[in-house]
Amino acid sequence: MSTTSTAIDLSTLNPNLSTLPPRNPEHNPLFIFQKCKDEKRPVFIAGPMVRYSKLPFREICRYYKTDIVYTPMILAREFVRNEVARLSDFSTNEFDRSVIVQIGANNVTDLIKMVDMIHPYVDGIGLNCGCPIKEQVREGIGAALMSEPEK
């Protein structure tokens, strides 16, 4: 586990260009699932946890051989509009691989903008459709999306 790596500052980058090396196809979650199936072993996944699944926690999970890690839910609306939110909500480094960002969004426009900004830095993108937190549901995020699937 490396704690001396430098986090990537997303606020200074062109959202369509990555300064990281190209993503390795072996870090793709689908590849990992197939590999684990071939090895006849379970896939070890550290699911998203509010406030805890940030980079230092993901590094600890890697140390203990976790195959796939998630970020905590990041609100697309705040991420695309606010540099402070980008800097506090997501950081990564060259060792942060097989990572899936979990996005909370209530509209397609913010979702697409966030995906455009973050996709060079992650190996998968998940839309949160299950968070039952009242504040999120009230905003039309998380579990609220299941009540209006056409949205």
Positions of predicted regions on the chain:
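Eukaryotic N-terminal low-complexity, Ser/Thr- and Lys/Arg-rich leader segments
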Residues: 1-39
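Extreme N-terminal starter segment of soluble prokaryotic enzymes
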Residues: 42-44
